[in-house]
Each structure stands twice: as C-alpha cells, then as structure tokens.
Amino acid sequence: MKQFAKRMVCLLTGILMVLAMLTGCSGTPKDEKSDSLVPSSTTEERGVLRIGMECAYAPFNWTQSTAEVANGDTAVPIYGTNDYAYGYDIMVAKLLAEELDMDLEIHKVEWSSIVLGMNAGDYDIILAGMSYSTERDQSVDFTEPYYVRDNVIIVNKEGAYANASGLSDFTGASCTTQIGTSWVHYVPQIPEVEQLTYYETTAEVVMAVSMGTADCGILDEPTALSATLANDNIAYIKLPAEDGFTVPEGTSLNICIAVKEGESALQKTLNDALVAISLDEEKMAELMNTAIEVQPLGD
C-alpha cells in the first residue's frame, strides 16, 4: 500500500511538472506579449511624426546648438544628436503636430539622400523646402503646398554682375546652384551661361558666389534674403517678368510635404491639417518673416 502511495505521489508530481512546462510554453506567449509593447509602424498610431530635413537650408530649416529661439519659441531636438532644428519648416511642423496631437522627431539628412531615407523607413515625411516636380512625383506623393516661392539670382556686391537687373544682363556669367533641386533647370536659361559644379548645400552656393568662384547663383528669395543678412558680400536680384525666369516644364514654385508613394491616408491627414491651421499666403509670409528674423547669423 505504501509502495502504491509512493508511486501515485511520483506520478502526480510528474504530471504537475509537465503541466507547469506546458503552461510556460502556452498561455500568453512571451514573444506575443513583447510584440504588443512595440509601437505600431503607422505614423498615426505611433503618435510621433518623424520628419526628414537638411537642417542646413535657412530660413526653411537650420541647425543650432541650443533650444532657445529669439522669438521665445523653442527649437526641436535633432534625433541622435545634441543639436536642435528650427526655421520655417519647423514652425509649420509644430503647428501640424499640435493639430494632429503628435510629437515631433526631426531627422537630419543630406539633401541628396533625403528621398531614399524616407523610402527606407527612417522617417515618415519630408518637410524640407522641397518643391513639387513631375520627376519627384514618380517616387513620392505630395501634399498641397505649404509655401510658394520665387526664385532669384545672388551675386557678389563687388562682382561684375552687381548692377544687373534682368536675365539678359547675366549673358556669359558663370553660375552654380544646389544639386538635386529644381534650380538646376533654371541655370540654362541664362544666355551663354558657364555652368559650374553644383553644390550639396545652399550655404556652399552662397560661399562660392561670395568668394568669386561663381559669378552668380540661383536660389529662392527667402534663402537669398537670409544669405544677404548672414554675408555682407552677397546681394540678390529679383528678375522682372519681361526679362526673367520661366518656370521649367515639370517643375513648380509650390513647396510641399512629401510622403511615401501610396501613403494616401497620411497624405490626406496632412492635407486636412494644413487646412485646419489656416496656412494661407498671409500666414506663410508671417512665418517666413519670423524665420528670417530669428535665424542664427554667422553660424
């Protein structure tokens, strides 16, 4: 009888051990529980709007070492760095984030790889002073414009073209601009132009003109105005309609937010938010003027 009882105890103990092992392997799986803690890959469910921008294109966006801004606003931390980003793009991004009840995450990236980074999933959108073009529209989708710009020519105040007033006055000039932008399509409109190497950033374009490496450069008016405030050697010329640029086929003066191709839900969300924040021409001008006023000159 005692031997039988011992055998029963051993049997029950074994059964309990097996059940404990099965419970550990089944029930709520550990991996499944961990997965539930991982944020959704969709922008809205994650609650964070991840934005790619150069942070080197004042007054649209720039890098600064502190969060303080002269207008009392606060710059946004740049992901993975100790620096901060501010400018027109950040001001618009903050308005959108507030409207959407989302946090901002700014990713600093070189212009030449900015679309690749978004398509690789490094960030959700590009809000970086990017103009619409049919070529870009083949690889990304665009929102409605959040700014409309004019393009101008920058010159050295002491250079040969300082007194130019129309496009024809630049005949034979050497010209540069930023690579990968719609501005490269404007350079050939200068009669008998000498096309120079294009630069990675607008700051390099300004420096080339300031140093006399190039007779002139093509930028948008806000960037050119910022350049004149930061560099005493630079002036810019706004061309008259009768002797000025024509918008090249397939390009636009509209500055838009880019999303991954096919991200129609996010595109609509952003378009609705742009309407909600009432970003009309007057407000665009107000924000841009503020960005120009508070940019850190000489940085």
Model-inferred region functions:
Residues 113, 129-139, 186-189, 210-211, ...:
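A ligand-binding cleft/hinge motif common to bilobed small-molecule-binding domains
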Residues 20-24:
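C-terminal motif of bacterial Sec signal peptides marking the signal peptidase cleavage site
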